[in-house]
Amino acid sequence: MFPLVQAARAQPSQGPGDLALTGPTLRVRVPRSDDAAALFREASDADVTRWFSWGPYESRAQAEAYLERLPAERESGSQLDLIVERLDAGPIGISGLSEFSLRDRRATIGTWLGRAWWGTGANGESKALMCHLGFAVLGLERIGSYTSVDHVRSQRALERLGFGREGVLRRFHRHGERVLDVVVFGLLRSDWENGPLREVAVTVSGQPPPAFVVAGSALTAR
């Protein structure tokens, strides 16, 4: 499914604003203000945002407002959203880690991609990059994910990538006037080390924001 694993190569140290992880066809990196046009284009599709509590975007200003609040979220350690970009096509979506508990060494992953990139392998590669970030760089021990009980395609995708189905949280996610049940998935460090996401070749450059790094992890010891 993925190219054979290569040792992840750390590039020369840069600041947190330069964090990027690069795979065979994708890169995840810190968002910039000039990403607004691409995010508006991809997230103005109602099918793309169907399962989320926001969207679809109706103006570029909404994408700009989203990008403007991200630096404060990175500074506080509340959410680490990164641009997913094709190396040959530019930004195609967002993948992020949230619900951090550094004490428990866990976080939750969420991803959205433009419709043109569904079924292309971009979801799997972007999650491989983000899970490498979480486990190998930040020092996490668990990455979880939620998906609606009705979103069967997402559930199957998570299972293919090695996430384990752990149960259902009833009336967990408010979606407009509805409150949805969600299926909980989890990926432990040991699952990742022995699963398909670990097979993706990853190059890391820059440094993550300090608020997301587990004390004593390989990054802080480096």
Model-inferred region functions:
Residues 1-46, 81-222:
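Acyl-donor (CoA/ACP) binding surface of acyl/acetyltransferases
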Residues 69-70, 133:
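A generic secondary-structure signal
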Residues 49-69, 82:
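Conserved GNAT-fold acetyl-CoA-binding loop/helix
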Residues 48, 57, 76-79, 143:
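Secondary-structure boundary/capping residues
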Residues 59-61, 74, 192-193:
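A short hydrophobic/aromatic micro-motif that marks alpha-helical segments and, especially, helix-coil
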Residues 72-77, 163:
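Short loop/turn motifs at secondary-structure junctions and domain boundaries
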Residues 43, 52, 74-75:
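Hydrophobic residues in alpha-helical segments
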